[in-house]
Swiss-Prot record:
Entries under NCBIfam families matching the protein: lon_rel
EC class name: hydrolase
Keywords of this entry: ATP-binding, Cell membrane, Hydrolase, Membrane, Nucleotide-binding, Protease, Serine protease, Transmembrane, Transmembrane helix
Cellular component GO terms, alphabetical: plasma membrane
Gene3D superfamilies hit by this protein: 1.10.8.60, 3.30.230.10, P-loop containing nucleotide triphosphate hydrolases
Organism: Methanocaldococcus jannaschii (strain ATCC 43067 / DSM 2661 / JAL-1 / JCM 10045 / NBRC 100440)
Family classification: Belongs to the peptidase S16 family. Archaeal LonB subfamily.
GO molecular function: ATP binding; ATP hydrolysis activity; ATP-dependent peptidase activity; serine-type endopeptidase activity
Main location: membrane
Name of the featured protein: Archaeal Lon protease
Function as written in the Swiss-Prot or TrEMBL entry: ATP-dependent serine protease that mediates the selective degradation of mutant and abnormal proteins as well as certain short-lived regulatory proteins. Degrades polypeptides processively.
Keyword Metal-binding appears in the UniProt entry: no
Length: 649
């Protein structure tokens, strides 16, 4: 399984602390992103959730210091005395140091009533001293001088009080502190700034609302209400925007302007705010743009913006099941255990994680790269090993679907994560909402479904296989075909809503009629007038939307059975698509469908030969691969009991 032998992950070396070394399966994408950043090119990363888009950007952010020299800078906001609604924002190279020269001198304020009272008491005490201790010949001069000092001092106090009151009554009065520049941002190393596309204020900046009108002396001046956006904080660095599906069109226009002009002003975003009338000068924002999203998110971007993205990278969601890649997956397991302080995992547990990676990839020779999902399974298996039940596990999911385990405080009693713990998490589906819904549906509805495996042969009755939604759970569908004499021949589909399914059933009907009419099948010949046959096809007890072409072979065989009145054996289930030449084509979800056939108790399952490379488990049921419809006919028709077969049930 792995190139190294071990009993538990405790014996394995610790993973590298560098994120760039912890990226699994996306090495080519990492090289391209590094090259793009080095050459100052814009990048968009597309791929399934959990394949490592954000991790790649974080890993690149850790080594930004290696991309040449960087000049630190800081951003300050100053008032514009000519127009207070147009504050000035400056980007200044160097490290920020608050200069005492920038501190404005405060206006002299009128003394308080307490100060005046103390001055009066002091004057009275001074007068008492002079009257009591000074000689009579100096008394008149001393009193005169004291009176003049008190008079001058009182005049100054009254004058400053009057001027202060008159200044306070002015509508545009500015306190000197309101003239002081404000530090908005200080950048000491090359920045990597992350922002979500839906948060316009965080991305583009804003002007805060002032309930007092935004004008001194009561209000806060505009330059003190500026919120710098991520687009400006990323100056001389990287701006990483995720969730591009939620990006409004107006935000795309602003980003496009910033990419073109390398500068962008900040204005009030809320038209009902006092900041709506405020706009700064254009602020430098020369950055490298990296965006990420799912595959279909790219269609929400404007063409001019998409044209300015130099590298469009699609991340892989699978990798080949080789010894080298299994070792990488083992490295990932060790990383998760180390980073989340989990219990060690046994060798069998690691092998079970690899098996689950095969299932999630849908093939025996592939391993999934949806590593966030695997990480959730590993963390939940750790909790199962510690004795937690399902309800406790479900309570540790966050809004984004990521699982956060509780760390084990007491490790005196060593606990190991085994294959049984990992398998329990996977089989119960607690890592996926869709799988839980599908499992509950099957559990509650299975006893009502009229499916009788290994029953007597029947005419026009066959069992097909399907996968329920996105949960990855297979199910068995009973298909019934009935032929009626009619003047208006045709094919009628019951309980089928998907367009692909309708087209595939039409193909199956046409192919079955062609084969019966040409009498080329290895079956008893029978003259049939197809011009007066009305065909009804029912997917029995199917209440959800049915789509896809994997039931084409099953429907074709059921129609042939009904037309020729030859019974079909009931000990098998079948899946596979067909072309008009009768070739059996590959389908998806083959492992889930085989599991469904085993769960219902069928002895055999027939699948396309092209899907044999995808089959993971072969025990418990006979798996028959086929290439053409001619190979299937001898396997499924009961030619010995034609007369006594049931029509349908």
């Amino acid at each position: 399984m792995f190139s190294i032998k071990f009993k538990t992950t405790e014996e394995l070396p610790e993973p590298s602390p560098r994120l760039i070394d912890q990226v699994i399966g996306q090495e080519e994408a990492v090289k391209i992103v590094l090259s793009a950043v080095k050459n100052k090119r814009n990048v968009i990363l597309l791929g399934d959730p959990g394949v490592g888009k954000s991790m790649i950007v974080k890993a690149v952010g850790e080594i930004l210091s290696d991309f040449g020299e960087f000049t630190p800078y800081y951003v300050i906001a100053k008032p514009n005395l000519k127009n207070m609604e147009r504050p000035i924002v400056e980007v200044i190279d160097g490290e920020y140091k608050e200069d005492s020269k920038d501190m404005p001198k405060l206006d002299f304020k009128a003394p308080s009533s307490t100060t005046l009272l103390l001055i009066m008491i002091g004057a009275i005490l001074l007068s008492e001293y002079l009257l009591k201790y000074l000689p009579q010949n100096y008394l008149l001069a001393a009193v005169t001088i004291t009176a003049l000092i008190v008079l001058i001092f009182g005049f100054v106090i009254i004058l400053t009080s009057i001027m202060g009151a008159s200044r306070a009554s002015m509508p545009n009065n500015l306190n000197p502190m309101d003239l002081k520049p404000v530090l908005l941002y200080e950048c000491k190393k090359r920045p990597l700034v992350r922002a979500s596309a839906y948060n316009v204020t965080r991305l583009l900046g804003d002007i805060k609302h002032c309930p007092l009108g935004g004008r001194p002396p009561l209000g806060t001046p505009p330059h003190k209400r500026i919120i710098l956006g991520a687009i400006h904080e990323a100056h001389r660095g990287i701006l990483y925007v995720d969730e591009i599906k939620t990006m409004p069109l107006e935000v795309q226009d602003y980003i496009l302007t910033a990419l073109q002009d390398k500068q962008l002003p900040i204005s009030g975003r809320n038209p009902n705010s006092s900041g709506a009338t405020v706009e700064t000068n254009p602020i430098p924002c020369d950055f490298i743009l990296i965006m990420s999203g799912n595959m279909d998110d790219v269609y929400n971007l404007r063409a001019p913006l998409l044209d300015r993205i130099d590298y469009k990278i699609v991340l892989k969601n699978k990798m080949d099941n080789t010894l080298e890649n299994r070792d990488k997956l083992l490295q990932f397991i060790v990383q998760e255990i180390k980073n989340n302080n989990l219990n060690p995992m046994t060798y069998d547990g690691c092998c079970e994680v690899v098996r689950i990676a095969q299932y999630l990839a849908g093939s025996k020779d592939k391993l999934t790269l949806r590593l966030r999902l695997l990480a959730n399974i590993i963390k939940m298996a750790n909790d199962v090993a510690m004795g937690k039940d399902v309800e406790e596990l479900l309570g540790n999911f966050d809004d984004k679907g990521e699982y956060h385990p509780e760390t084990q405080k007491d490790k005196s009693n060593k606990v190991y994560i085994t294959a049984e713990h990992v398998r329990k998490v996977f089989d119960t589906g607690i890592y996926s909402m869709e799988k839980q819904v599908a499992l509950n549906y099957i559990k509650n509805f299975k006893r009502y479904k009229h499916i009788v495996p290994n029953d007597e042969p029947k005419v026009g009755v066959i069992y097909g296989l399907a996968v329920l939604g996105a949960g990855g759970i297979g199910d068995v569908t009973k298909i019934i075909v009935q032929i009626l004499e009619s003047k208006n021949p045709g094919t009628h589909l019951l309980n089928i809503s998907g367009d692909i399914a309708k087209h595939s059933i039409t193909l199956a009907s046409a192919l079955s009629k062609k084969l019966v009419a040409e009498k080329k099948l290895p079956l008893p010949k029978k003259d049939i007038d197809l011009n007066n046959k009305e065909i009804y096809i029912q997917f029995s007890q199917s209440y959800s939307k049915i789509d896809g072409d994997s039931a084409t072979a099953a429907v074709c065989l059921a129609i042939i059975s009904a037309l020729l009145d030859i019974p079909l054996k009931q000990d098998f289930a079948i899946t596979g698509s067909l072309d008009l030449s009768g070739n059996v084509l590959a389908i998806g979800g083959v492992n889930e469908k085989i599991e469904a056939a085993k769960r219902y108790g069928f002895k055999r399952v027939i699948i396309p030969e092209a899907n044999m490379i995808d089959v993971i488990e072969t025990e418990g049921i006979e798996i028959i691969p086929v290439k053409t419809l001619d190979e299937i006919v001898p396997l499924v028709f009961d030619l010995d009991n034609r007369g006594g077969a049931e029509r349908f049930n």
